[in-house]
Amino acid sequence: MLVVDDDPDIRELLFTALEDDGFEVVPAGNGEEALAIMKTFRPDVIVLDLMMPVMDGWQFANELRARDEGDEDIPLVLLSAARDLKTHAKALAAADIIEKPFDLSELLPKIARVASAA
């Protein structure tokens, strides 16, 4: 699983919680870093913040979907404090959406459901 978020506290929280749930987790601080990681690691699921510096979640998702490397079908779980998340999710063909601030007790089952379907 790839967790992409520019907030180090959120990255650490998700990394720890998902590892405790048995997932292999690789963190990234922005979309550019995530694409570099994906040269050597193919995640089953990508947990993706939409608002980040350098390369935001929109840019990352669009680049991922345009690639011809077998990565375009990886499910995305979007994280965002932005409103109108359903529009974002539909535009990016996301598997699920999670509004910030989030509750781990709601977030973890959603991610597990997406991962089990991947």
For each predicted feature, which ranges?
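Short hydrophobic/Thr-rich beta-strand motif most characteristic of the beta2 strand and flanking loop
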Residues: G22-G29, I37
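Charged docking surfaces used in two-component/phosphorelay signaling
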Residues: E12-D20
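Active-site beta3 strand of CheY-like receiver
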Residues: F41-V47
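C-terminal output helix
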Residues: F102-R113
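Receiver (REC) domain active-site loop signature in two-component systems and cognate sites
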Residues: M52
